[in-house]
Amino acid sequence: MTTFFNKLFTGASSSSSAAASSGMDLGSMESLCAAINELCSEKHVSENVGELAAGIVRKNKELFEKKSNDVEAFLLHCSPNVGSAAMVAAIKGMFDTSAAKNNETGTDRAVELLNHYVDENNFVGGHLKLVPEIIFPLLRDVGLYCLEKKNKPEIGQRIIMKALGSMFPRNGSNAPNVLTSAHGVLFACALETKDYASVEPFIDLHVDEIANENCIQDQEKSDNRERDFGDVFLGRMKKGAAFGSQPVAHNPHLHPKYVLDYLYNGACILIELKRFEDALFLLEICVGMPAFSVQDQHLDSFKKYVLISLILKGKVDVTENGDKSAIRHFKTKSPEYKQFSEIRFSRSSNTHSAVESLVKSAKDRLRKDGNTEIAKYLVVEMKKKTIMSLTRMFTSIRISEIEELAFLKSRDQVTELIGQLVEEQRITVRIDGDMVFWTELSPVPSKNDVENKIRIVDHLNTLLHEKNTTMKAGSGRMRPSVMYNEDEGLSMPPTESKFFS
Amino acid sequence: MQNELLDDPMDTGAPAAEAAAADEPLPPAHGIDREVTPKPAGNPDLMQQSLDNPAIPMHLIEKRDDRRESCDDGYSLTVNESAIDIESLACSYDSNAFFLRARFIARHCPILRADAYISLINYLKEHTTDITHYVAFFNELESELARKEFKNRQLNFQIPLRDQKWIEENGATWQSTTDQLQAEYKRHKDEGVKESTRRAMEDLFQHYMMAGKIDEAIRLYSRGIRDYCTQLKHSINMWINWMEVAICANDWGKLDTVTNTAYRSLKDADDAEKNSQQSQQAPPQRGENAPYMVERDPNAPIQTLTNRQLIETALAKCLAAQVLLKLRNKRYSQVVETILQIKTECLQSKWFVTSSDLGIYGMLSAMATMSRADLKLQVSGNGTFRKLLESEPQLIELLGSYTSSRFGRCFEIMRSVKPRLLLDPFISRNVDELFEKIRQKCVLQYLQPYSTIKMATMAEAVGMSSAELQLSLLELIEQKHVSLKIDQNEGIVRILDERDENAILKRVNVTCDRATQKAKSLLWKTTLAGANIHSISDKETRPKRKNQKESAKFDRNFGGIDVDEDPRGIAGPSGLSDDFNIAYDQQPQQQVQYLEDLGDI
């Protein structure tokens, strides 16, 4: 594996050898490693070792950045069974430090190390989840690095998939569906590699949680702020503590743009997989998200939403997409898609010809937006809808009349479309001379199926009530201005660790 | 010259830029006017020269005529049947109403084109000074007579001779009269006497109307005519004129605005009149409650009756105009409601729409939109509608056939009256749609008792061909009015049972899927809210909104607009201009007085 990475990342070298040959002092990292390994001793309960290790890591985060040269030695001596969190923190420190210095050798080495440990299943997934502020930003940054810097999206995809798979196994478990910033990058890599099937399991239409990648830093900030207030205003410690604790509850768990990435990129993958209903759902969520200023992905989502909605429904229900003013803004920004959004399928109006004309006139815009293939699919689907509408109105019909009523150009076209519909198992056809006997294949749900769906609706309704109650009781009613910490707390001034003291 | 006088900002208070923008359409018309009616009225030789040179003036005349006919030019209709008697048309409609309808017939009915143009030419010569249309129609008539297809055709009217003397005389006097009237209007306006200004404005308006210059008339009325109407009868006359000129110009937007405003004003006047009558024991007094009332002798019942009649006549015309608007906008159910509100006995007999016209419009709209029960109650059993249709026995039979389910006879009558309706300029565009709706209702009614029926039998019963019937059925299916399947092999139609268990299960399944989708969408939002993610971008990153400036501008403009005035807001400044002029006139006196006071010191 090391040899394989050396071929991919040219210029990579072993920093551990260099460190060993230089005779650098590894005392601090060595002490940290020893402290973590001691958690394996009998005096600690096995279930708590992960949390304890995570706590140690958070308190010594700056050490990994300062001692990035000792990372490999640390990784060699640290036990993955208890030190997974520390190991990823070390790799992250190495990666971030190298990236900050534009040290491509260092970043390549960090990626190589991460891939090695992830690929060998050395990390304990449960422990990694305890440091969301470390593992998910690391996966995201590594994925982006492979995608944009190295033009090797397949490597980034594999690393993220293995890591997420270890943290959130997909083997039928009842684990909650978690949205992280790494998911969006994973989907972006998959769109480049065109490997859609392998990432499909990671696309959840129903998300239970959003990873809190900011909370821990905010808590530490709050603690530091309390100490500062305590030192300066000794007699007003309570007020300072109260003031410092307020921002914690209202900081977003994740930068909203990562949610946008998840929704948009996930929808794009589902479109490639022809799962249009699910893609439409994600796009609808994306388009309906409120925003003070329209993002590019926001607008791109609307464009895809229009096309996919036409494919599925033959019309665009813009009134269900939340803010109407936003919809108007989208239409203003994209006049071609405004015309698409005004289409309502009607056989007698010859909609498929109108759509085809629109696609031809807007082909440049569609090409720029990367929607050419979807538009072509839309044109064909509109023709199929025309045929399907006839199957619902006739039990038997002459072929010549199909051509006339469907506004098609030739009998061959009619035959081709009917053949495609049969292959897709949407209709059954029997031809007797000039007469076509056909029927639509629409499965009739059984009573049990309907009852199950009713139970699902009831369950969702109950869940909504519970969530609404929780939000009313909690901080959901407070909507302060959104504040983000872009540097993720890694630029905090170094402080003496309590552990070492 | 005339534009400078009328567009003086000091006179009307209108912004100069707005006046310039409003005048943009004028150059072609003005150019035509100059060509047709040159200024030197005393020099007939120049007029003769311009008329002897047919290329330029005729082209400009044609161009102007085409511009005024822009609404009809986009409507391609040809009726190859003499469904209307032009002579009867002239007897049924008066003045501009006849002009409008005859011109429409001339454009869309080749068989009646020559007769229509002859009638129009005779009308213009006898009742107007419209030499522009006179010449244009003469040219059209000559072109029509020169066609090969016309050689074997017989005319119902005598072909008139071009009266060059009449053209010259009217062309010579028109401009001088225009200048005189404009000067009179400006003088009275400068003097600040409202009644005189109104009278001068009215004279100028009628002058424009007589010459067929509809655009000029509309523009004149848009410059604050309301401010000079101090009496009820003047306001009523103003509203009626405004509605009529809007109809003549095919300006439906203007007509919508005018009728809405007029209706509110007339209703207020009507309420005031009723209150006045209720308190007839005490003498009526002017005040806010009676803005349109004039003090009068309570012992004069004729005056009271006259005011009452004026209001009711104006209201009837206003509602009739609204019927035309609703018909134009395809609001058929509202057409019926509005017609039922009209006091047709107060409607002028030869106006743009007669009682018979209203009856036809209302009946067809009702048949296309109402259920049979409502139709029997509100139309067949309504004395008002029977009275409106008393001169239309064929249409009464149509209504009876429809309600009696005699569909074959119903469609036969529809086919026979269709050409005539297509030549009605106000319902022509709606005929096909209305007839299709009626036909679909008939088909639905016929299908109701059957679960399976042969196509041939049904086609025979409803008087359609199999192809026509199939098309109607397809439209009904696609509009979800009926659920059926056509078996062409067997030639039968099968009605689908929507109460079938499978159908119900499918519908419940779809409903559950929709509910699930909605619930999941809401859960997404709660999850985001739980993570304190409320918006994609921060408020501080929001770009400066352009509508803030527009909102401020709107606020400034809104303060100067009277909501009852013309939407363009021209009348508002015009109303203010009078006060401004008065203040401006008084200002020098104040200064002089101040100087005098200083002199004393």
From Swiss-Prot, chain A:
Keyword Nuclease applies? no
Q: Which organism is it from?
A: Caenorhabditis elegans
**Protein name per the record:** COP9 signalosome complex subunit 3
Instruction: Name any GO cellular component annotation.
Output: COP9 signalosome
Q: Which residues pair up as cystines?
A: none
Q: Which UniProt keywords are given for this protein, alphabetically ordered?
A: Cytoplasm, Developmental protein, Differentiation, Nucleus, Oogenesis, Signalosome
The family classification in the record reads: Belongs to the CSN3 family.
InterPro entries for this protein? COP9_N (IPR055089), CSN3 (IPR050756), PCI_dom (IPR000717)
Q: Which residues form the PCI domain?
A: 275-445
Q: Does the keyword Cytoplasm apply?
A: yes
Compartments it resides in = Cytoplasm; Nucleus
On subunit structure and binding partners, the annotation says: Component of the CSN complex, probably composed of csn-1, csn-2, csn-3, csn-4, csn-5, csn-6 and csn-7. Within the complex it probably interacts directly with csn-2 and csn-4. May interact with itself.
Q: Which Pfam families match?
A: COP9_hel_rpt (PF22788), PCI (PF01399)
From Swiss-Prot, chain B:
List the GO terms this entry assigns under cellular component, sorted alphabetically.
COP9 signalosome; cytoplasm; nucleus
Bias regions of kind Acidic residues — which residues?
1-10
Q: Where in the cell is it found?
A: Cytoplasm; Nucleus
Q: Which InterPro entries does the UniProt entry name for this protein?
A: PCI_dom (IPR000717), Rpn7/CSN1 (IPR019585), Rpn7_N (IPR045135), WH_DNA-bd_sf (IPR036390)
Q: Which SUPFAM superfamilies match?
A: Winged helix' DNA-binding domain
Q: Does the keyword DNA-binding apply?
A: no
Locate the compositionally biased regions of type Low complexity. 14-24
- Cite the Pfam families for this sequence: PCI, RPN7
Query: Superkingdom, according to UniProt?
Result: Eukaryota
Keywords from the UniProt entry? Cytoplasm, Developmental protein, Differentiation, Nucleus, Oogenesis, Signalosome
Q: Name one GO biological process term.
A: regulation of oogenesis
Query: Segment Disordered: which positions?
Result: 1-54, 268-294, 535-581
Gene3D superfamilies, A to Z = 1.25.40.570
Keyword Signal included in the entry's annotation = no
PCI domain residues are: 338-500
Q: Which family does it belong to?
A: Belongs to the CSN1 family.
Functional summary from the UniProt entry: Essential component of the COP9 signalosome complex (CSN), a complex involved in various cellular and developmental processes. The CSN complex is an essential regulator of the ubiquitin (Ubl) conjugation pathway by mediating the deneddylation of the cullin subunits of the SCF-type E3 ligase complexes, leading to decrease the Ubl ligase activity of SCF. The CSN complex plays an essential role in embryogenesis and oogenesis and is required to regulate microtubule stability in the early embryo.
Q: How does it assemble?
A: Component of the CSN complex, probably composed of csn-1, csn-2, csn-3, csn-4, csn-5, csn-6 and csn-7. Within the complex it probably interacts directly with csn-2, csn-4 and csn-5. May interact with itself. Interacts with rbx-1.
Specify the protein name: COP9 signalosome complex subunit 1
Protein species of origin: Caenorhabditis elegans
Q: Which gene encodes it?
A: csn-1
